């Protein structure tokens, strides 16, 4: 993925309200209907599963230099600073894939980690959870909103062009709140 171009979105502006959860779920059902263990969803930014994250040789082949584990200390996620050693920068987010889990508490720190990494020449970032569909996707969507200034709708469409993702409804509500906060801040 050399260049990323945003899809035509019909002149969406700051006044456009956040899509409803049902509209977001429809957007999530559209686009790519399958995913690999790991997919590049933005230049040098990958979403993947725990099996990929647990395979240091695969990470080396992909050129991954930074790992954000959205299921830190989870059952299937053995990664951590000791696992990767000094060759990979690591951030662990102990998120649970439950609608009532407050993943928004990690939006800023996760987005900042991704942003700093992608501003490092030659860096590639893997964001993963167990399956690479809900927690990791939520944090990548938050990054695209916070640092790439995409609306939630634009971020979902962009990621869905490259990977099947489906954050749980609680995470979608939290992303909607972030979208509304960012749009409100942009109107001041």
Curated annotation (Swiss-Prot):
BP-aspect Gene Ontology terms: dephosphorylation
Family annotation (Gene3D superfamilies): Protein tyrosine phosphatase superfamily (3.90.190.10)
Gene Ontology cellular-component terms listed: cytoplasm
Enzyme Commission number: 3.1.3.16, 3.1.3.48
Expression across tissues: Skeletal muscle specific.
UniProt cross-references to InterPro entries, sorted A to Z: Atypical_DUSP_subfamA, Dual-sp_phosphatase_cat-dom, Prot-tyrosine_phosphatase-like, Tyr_Pase_AS, Tyr_Pase_cat, Tyr_Pase_dom, TYR_PHOSPHATASE_DUAL_dom
Location in or out of the cell: Cytoplasm
Keywords, comma-separated and alphabetical: Cytoplasm, Hydrolase, Protein phosphatase
Catalytic site positions: 129 (phosphocysteine intermediate)
Subunit structure, as described in the record: Monomer. Interacts with MAP3K5/ASK1; may compete with AKT1 preventing MAP3K5/ASK1 phosphorylation by AKT1.
Family the entry assigns: Belongs to the protein-tyrosine phosphatase family. Non-receptor class dual specificity subfamily.
Reported function: Probable protein tyrosine phosphatase. Has phosphatase activity with synthetic substrates. Has a phosphatase activity-independent regulatory role in MAP3K5/ASK1-mediated apoptosis, preventing MAP3K5/ASK1 inhibition by AKT1. Shows no phosphatase activity on MAPK1/ERK2, MAPK8/JNK, MAPK14/p38 and MAP3K5/ASK1.
Name of the featured protein: Dual specificity protein phosphatase 13A
Organism expressing this protein natively: Homo sapiens
Lineage: Eukaryota, Metazoa, Chordata, Craniata, Vertebrata
